[in-house]
Amino acid sequence: MLDTFLERPHQMTKAPERWSPSQAVRLAIDWRVGHCVALALGGVLTGQGAIAQDRFLPQASAVVLAASVHTAGGRSSTLRALDQAWRAQPQDLSAALAYARAVFTLGFNEGDLRWFGSAKAALTPWWQATDLPADGHFMRGLVKQGFHDFDGGLQDINRAIALDPARAEFWSWRFALHLLLANMDAAQQDSEDIARLFGPQEGQIYSAVLAYRTGQALAAVQKLSESIRLPDYQDAASQVWIGFHLGEAHRVAQQPEQAIALWQRLLQVHPQSHLLRLSLADLLNQQGRFQQAKAVATASSTQLNSNLTDALLMQALLASRGLKAPDEAALAQQMAARLQSQALRQESLIERPKLIYQIAYGKDLAAGLALSIENWQQQKEPPDAVLFAQAALARQQARAAEPVVQWAQTTGYTDPQLAPLITQLKAHPSWSKERP
C-alpha cells in the first residue's frame, strides 16, 4: 500500500525524468491511494496471458481470463504496440521493460493496480537475474514493492542507483520506500543527496515532504508553496505531484480548507488525476461534507460504478452513509462483491479500501484489526495508522495499536485524525493492562 512518488514520466529542465505521486508508494509513497492490488500469481501470469482488467465476479472454475489485458477497448495505440512488441519477443529485455513501465504507470494513473501483474509477467524471465542494467533493476524493484516485497524492491533500487546515480527517479523512489518503512534517517540522507545531485530546488521538495512526515507541517507548507510556483515545476506532472503534497501538508497542519481549495483547483485542471480525486473525496468525507465528497468520488461514473476504483467506490459508500442516502445498500453490495471477487482470484495483499470497509465502515472490526496488525509489519503510513488505532479502540484492545503510538513518537508525525486517537489509546483502560 504505498496510498505513494508515482509520477508520470516527464523531462524537466533541472531534474531528470521523475514519476508523479500518485497512491505511493501503495507503489512508493502515495499515502492515500488504496494501493498495491497485488496478485497471488500462482503461475497464472505467463508471457502469453495476464489477469483480465475488467472487473468481474468469476466462477470458481474460471477466476482468470487468459486474454491480454489490452484487448479491452480504449487503450492507446502506443500501449497496444508495446504489448504486441513484448508478446512477439518475450525474451527481449528492452521490449519487456518498455511494456512493464507502461502498464505499471497505467495501473497507478487509473488507480487499478492489477496492471502490476502484467508488469511482473513481462519481467518474469529476469526475476532472479543479478546482471540487469540499471533500468532493469529499477523496474523490477518497482514491481517488487508493488507486491509488498519492500526489502527486495529496495535492494533492486539501490543497485540501480549504484549503476546509474544520475537518474533522479531512482532516488525519488528510494526516498519514498524509506518513508514507507519509517527509516527517516535514510530518507533525510536521500533528500540531501537529491539536493546535491539535482539542485536545491529539487531537494527542497523532498525535505518538505519529510518535514510534514516528522511533525513540521507548517515548514512544509512554506517550502511547497514556494516550489509549486517555480518556473521549472509548471508542467502537469509536477503541479499534481507538488500540489498533492502541499495539500497533505495543509491537512496535517490543521488547515483542511486550504487543502480542499487547492485540490479542487488542481482537479479542475487535471481531472484524470486519481490521486487528487481520491485525496479530495477522502478529506471532504473527513470534514463531514458528504454531498461534495460523493460528487467528487463518482464524477463520470457509470450506472453500476464499474469504472470506479475500489478506493473511490469506498469513499462514495462512506459519503452515502453520512448522507443516509438510499443507495448506500447498493454501494455496500458492490464493494462486497468486489472483495469477494478478489478473494476468488486469491489476491493476497491488503488493500486500504478493504481496511476502510472493515474498520471505518464497520463491516468486520475483528478482521480489520487482524489485518491492520499484519499490514503494519510491512508498511507504516499515516492513513493505516488511523485505521489501526480506530480498530483497536473499537475492539477494546488499545494495546494492540502500541506500534502506532511508538511510530508516532519516534517520527514526530501527527495529524488532526491521528492525534486524538493516540490520546484515546493511552487513556483507554485496556492500555494499562499487561502487554499481549
Question: What are the residue ranges of the model-derived segments?
Answer:
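N-terminal leader/linker segments that initiate helical-solenoid repeat arrays
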Residues: 50-135, 427-431
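Short coil turns that delineate tetratricopeptide repeat
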Residues: 90, 131, 165, 198-199, ...
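Canonical tetratricopeptide repeat
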Residues: 98, 139, 173, 206-207, ...
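Structural motif corresponding to the intra-repeat A-B loop/turn of tetratricopeptide repeats
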Residues: 106, 110-113, 147, 181, ...
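TPR alpha-solenoid repeat register
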Residues: 95, 136, 170, 203-204, ...
